[in-house]
Amino acid sequence: MFDTIVPRGVDQLMALTQAFRKDDRTQKVDLIVGVYKDDTGGVPIMSAVKKAEAHLVAAETTKNYVGVIGDAEVNRIAPQLVLGENAPAIMDKRIGAVQTPGGSGALKVGFDLINSIRPGAKVWMSQPTWANHMPIARDAGMQIDSYPYFRESDRGLDFEAMMAHLDAEAVAGDVILLHACCHNPTGVDLAMPHWEALCKLIVARGLVPFVDSAYQGLGTSMEEDVAGLRHLAEHVPEMLIASSFSKNFGIYRERCGALTVIAKDEDSVPLIMAALQSVIRSNYSMPPSHGARIVGTVFGDAALKAEWAEELEVMRQRIAETRVLLRAKMEELQVTSDLSFLTDQRGMFSYTGFTSEQVNRLRDEFGVYTAGDGRINVAGVGSENIDYVASSFAAVMRSEH
C-alpha cells in the first residue's frame, strides 16, 4: 500500500523550528513560531490559568466524554467574546457554536461544513495569509483563490486593489476568509472604514465571510480587535467565526477553540448544529476538555477573569513596546530604510519585507531565525537579545543599499 505514497512538502515553519533546536550556536534567536514569549524568552503559563488548573485538579471527578459539540461554557463564552454579550445575532438566537481543537480545528470544521453543503465552494484568501489556511481549506475540498492585500512598497495595506479584485472576480456564494486582527503574517490590519466598505461589497456580492479570530486582545484591546468583525455580523445574513484561546490564554498545547456560525434566522440553527455534529463525529468525534475547562473556570470566577485580563494586557503592551524599541534601536544604527512598518503593524507578527537572501543570511551568519517569507514573531525579541536582533537586521538591510 505505502509503496505508492506521494511525497508531501515539509511544513516550513516546523522545519525551521527543528533547525533552530539543532543549531549549537550559543548566540541564536528564535523569531519563527507565533507563541507569546516573555522578556526572558520563556513561554509562560498565565497565573490565572495556573490557578484555574489547580481548582480543576481538586474538583474534577471524572474523565468522561464531553460530547460532540464540546464544552457548553466555551460554546457560550466564545460567541460573546467575539460578538459582544448583547449582539443582535445572539439576542435573536441566530447562532450555533461548537468547541473545537484550537483555531485550526474551527477552521477545518467550518470548511468541512461549507463543503458538505456546497461541494467545491470557493474561498478567497488574502495574499499572503497564514501558511496553514490553504492546506486546511484544500483538504476540506474547497477551491482556493486569493485577493491582493499586502503592498510590498510600503509594507502596508493595498485596500484599493483588494476591493477592485473582489468586486471583479468574486461571485455570490463564495466564501471570503478574513483576519479579525493582528493579520498573520503581515501584522497589517483593516481599519474600521475598510471594514465598513468591505461589508457593503460582501452584502452586494452575496459573499459569505469566514473570520479567523486567533489573536483577540493582543492587538489593541479585546473590544477593538473585533470591532470590524462585529460590524460585519450586524449586517450580513450568514457568517462563520473561528476563535482560538491558544494565544490569549497561552494554552497552545491544550487545543481549545470554537466555531461560531451565524444563521439567517433562528429556524436554521438546529439544521446547522446537526450538520456540524455530523462533520465532527466523523472527524475527531469530540474535542479535548482540559483547555475548555480552564477557559470556563476563568470566566466563571470574577477575580480570575480580572487577573487574566490584566495579564493579557501586559502581554499586549510588551509586544507594542518591543515594536517601538526595536525601531528606535535600528534607527540609532542609522538604517536608512523606512522603519515605520514596525510600529504601524499590530500584534505578534511583523512582515519585514526581507528577501530570501536576507532571511538566509540572518539565519546562517547571525543565528537569527525568521519565517522564510521574512515574518518575525515580535514577542521573540526581549531585553537580552534586542540589541543583537537590531544589529543583525541592520547588517542585512544595509547590504541591500
Roles of regions detected by a PLM:
Residues H55, E60-V203, G217-L218, A227-L229, ...:
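Conserved core of the PLP fold type I
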Residues L31, I144, P209, M239, ...:
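Hydrophobic beta-strand scaffold residues
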Residues M273-A292, V298-R327:
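Structural signature of PLP-dependent enzymes
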